[in-house]
Amino acid sequence: MQTPTPQQLMQQFAQKVARTRAYRYTWEFQERDEKTGKLSAKQIYTLEFLQPHYRKMTIVQRDAFSNGAVLIHNPDLDTKVHARKGFIRRVYERNDPEVARFFETDLGYILKELQRLFRGAKAEPVKSVQQGQRNGYQLVFAPPKDPVQRVSLTLERADLMPLRIEYADAKGTRSLRVYTEYAFPNLTKDDFTI
């Protein structure tokens, strides 16, 4: 299989996102602390997503209070985000800063952000790379006129799911997501009950 051009890879990823009905993935997330300039401790999340808008996220590792919490959004039942951890239950408005990033975790959101940054960007040729035990395509590009100065996107070669996404600026890495597991389960609306 021939290595795609940067434009072809972005187009193939967009097609993958459009045709993927349901998925589950786990990722490790770190972002730079602006006070120290260092990457934060690793956070781990699992997302289950069913088109067009059902989502459930489990906080695997973040802090003692949040670990094990599950956030669910099912707009057929309610416009709010429901969180539970054991017997504790909370309800958040969709625009509450506490849960704002919850809506930035699905492939559709990630694709839109990557497309925005890719428009007019200077891209390096796509490379074949290893990410852990998986074969991937790595696309590195420099967005024009944006605080993000460099994006490194690695997609799994066989099914084009993300393996790694790194955003950097003049100070270095701003945020890093490493996707450790993914699957395509047969999810239904019933999997997103509140």
Tell what function each PLM region has:
Residues 7-8, 111-127, 177:
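A short, amphipathic edge element
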Residues 25-27, 54-59, 78-84, 141, ...:
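Short hydrophobic/aromatic-rich beta-strand segments that constitute the beta-sheet cores
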Residues 1-54, 123-129, 190-194:
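N-terminal leader/targeting segments and the immediate start of mature chains
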Residues 17, 103-118:
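Short, solvent-exposed helix-to-loop capping segments enriched in aromatics
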Residues 30-32, 63-64, 122-194:
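Gly/Pro-enriched, hydrophobic low-complexity segments
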Residues 19-22, 47-56, 72-79, 134, ...:
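Short, solvent-exposed coil/turn segments at beta-strand boundaries
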Residues 46-106, 173-176:
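An acidic-aromatic
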Residues 7-10, 14, 108-111, 152:
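Extracytoplasmic/secreted envelope proteins and their assembly/folding machinery
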